[in-house]
Amino acid sequence: KILKGPLGSVATRLMSESFFSHQFRSIFSDQHPVTDQGVADNWALLVNNDGNRLGHKLVSYMTERVIYADRWHGAITNWQGDLRLAWGMQDPVALPEVLDGLLELHPDLPVTRWEDLGHYPQIEDPPRFAAAVDESMAASGSPL
């Protein structure tokens, strides 16, 4: 919320590696915490070319998801191809209620629910994530 406000650009300039570390760690599940090296790598990616000073500009998606809700919902409800979801049920960002909303739009949508994963399943459990991608591609007839 702070990033969306008039002090957003100031807040992004004041963000420290310590603050980032705390926030980033909080979106991983307790069972699969991010490593110190993972935090350091992601901080390095964020600060490259002063990317850490753009946070207030990147949160525009929060407003856009309201403005373009019909378009985004239509992309789910009208999709003609194979569509599947994998969801980390401990994700504090994309809460289970978000998944429930997607399932209201597309009730027959196959979902893999990972009770022990958070916001970044691909980092928390790469083999399981890769297996889900392989399974999804095989089910859709896509070449592996």
Task: Give the residues covered by each predicted segment.
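A conserved nucleotide-sugar
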Residues: 144
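Flexible "cap/lid" subdomain of the alpha/beta-hydrolase fold that forms the substrate-access gate
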Residues: 1-106, 110-113, 134, 139-141
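Catalytic histidine-centered segment of alpha/beta-hydrolase-like enzymes
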Residues: 114-130
